[in-house]
Structures are given as C-alpha cells and as structure tokens.
Amino acid sequence: MSDDVDSETRSRTPSISSRQFIIPEDELATLDSENSSLDSGGEEASSGGSDAYSAAGGSTPVFSRLGQHPSTFFTGSQVAPIFDTSLYLFESLTQSLDSVDFSEALSLQTKTSATINSKSRELQLLVGEVQTHLRRLQTAFEQGQHTAQRVRHNLRDITRGVESLKQTFARSYPIEYHQALERAYERRAE
C-alpha cells in the first residue's frame, strides 16, 4: 500500500538536468570557425598539433584545444591526435626509469639478493648440522634406554636375592639376625 502511494507522489523526471552539461551554441560556432580556419590552411593542420596551436594564438586554453578536431573520432581520419597516449607513456617511462636511479635500484636488489642467498646457505648448513647432532643424540638416548633397562633388571634381581638372604638368615640365625636389626635401627636413630 505504501509503495503505491510513494510511486504516485514521486516525480518521474530525472533529478539532474542535462541542460547544465550542454555546450552552448555560440561556443560551438566559435569552435567550428576555429576548426575551419585551421583546416583551410591545408598543410598547417596536418603539420602537427604544436605548430597549429602556436599559430592559433600562442597559449590557448586546454579546453579550446580539445575541441579543435571533433570529427576525427567519428570519421577515423588521423589529422592531428588530441592526446598521444603512446608518446605520453613512453615519456613517463623514460622519466621514471632514469638510468642512474635504475642502476642504483638494480645494484641494491643485487646486494639484497646476495645477502638473502648467503643467509639461506648458512641456514641450510645449520639445519644439516642440527640434523646430524639430533641423530647422534637419538642413538645415545636409545643406548641409554637399553642401559637403564639392564640396570633396572639387575636391581630387581639383586633385591630378590637380598630378600631371600634375609629370610634365610632370619630362619637359620634368628638371635643374631634380630641383634643386627636392632643395631641397624639404632644407627638410623642417631
């Protein structure tokens, strides 16, 4: 319901007037008369844009230069280009790739690359050394495990032997065994 009301109250005209962007007819007539005077010179129009611009009045505004050859876009004839993009790109690249700056950047990049390569080699050597050291430690650890298992097994056997000897002495020599135990407890108490 609200959409119906909004559509009835809204204006269907564009919000921006296109008349603001139209070139007035008196300026078009001025541009056409300048074009005809430049084209009537024959060789003057085809000799180059800078000669035509200087002959047309020295330092003309940029906007008047843009309208000098309006028909070249539509007809496809190349009398004098408005803006030579390839020349502009070439000149900007030439300025940006100044030989001194380029050689300095190239030497800096070479030095940086050499530093990175040397550090990479050092790192690879260190990794190799650490891996060999790790292998040695792993073998030493495995040998230590085997030794610890042997010692644990031997201690278990010795403990069983001592317990069996205690029981044998306690049965065979009870008086001496208890006297020896009392002495041992007295030593611990001191």
UniProtKB/Swiss-Prot annotation:
CC per GO annotation? BLOC-1 complex; endosome
Chief site of localization? other
The listed locations are: Endosome
Q: Which cysteines are joined by disulfide bonds?
A: none
Q: Which domain of life is it from?
A: Eukaryota
Q: Do you know which Pfam families this protein is assigned to?
A: KxDL (PF10241)
Q: Which InterPro entries match?
A: BLOC-1_subunit_KXD1 (IPR051390), KxDL_dom (IPR019371)
Annotated family: Belongs to the KXD1 family.
Subunit relationships:
Component of the biogenesis of lysosome-related organelles complex-1 (BLOC-1).
- What protein name applies here? Biogenesis of lysosome-related organelles complex 1 subunit KXD1
Query: Source species, please?
Result: Eremothecium gossypii (strain ATCC 10895 / CBS 109.51 / FGSC 9923 / NRRL Y-1056)
